[in-house]
Amino acid sequence: AAEGTLSLAPDQPVHLAVVAGEAANSPTHDYTGEVLSSLLTTLCRQGGHLTLVEADGAPYLLYSEAVAAPDASLTENKQDQIVQAQVTQAAAFLTENAVPKTAEVDLVAALDLAALGLQGQAGNRVLYAAFNGLSTAGPMDFTQNLLRADPEAVADALEAQGNLVDLSGVHVVLTGLGDVAG
């Protein structure tokens, strides 16, 4: 697939977990961007499940609900209106509510919480993570000399501790990596 696109089965539900990594050291993410809007549109058209997680020092669930596809007996225009309204509502919800409550960022715990929302779901499973990649708490705390650590050694250590998040069969979209404020 080309950059920014995913190949999702059109006849399968979409299960989307969004990790919002709003933090003091990163610019605010635009939840109306093309990739997330496309994923939300596909979810709202095909039905599935939406999970929203805030990645702060104690990651928490913002939202987790099933999303029904529009009634097929409606006109295509009406279905499009319903889908667009749902996409706009989801983006607005994230923009307004993705606010850290706890200092720091525990990326591993946030990804694990998001992965729980995808476990056991049949169909397309997608994790969309909007964060700068700097975890400052939990098992992958970059303030503890991890910036220069060998990535394979970090992954091995996370696995040995039982902290390697299982994303088998999940499409992963990362946005905002390396974006830091100031």
Tell what function each PLM region has.
Residues 1-9:
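C-terminal region of N-terminal signal peptides and the immediate post-cleavage residues
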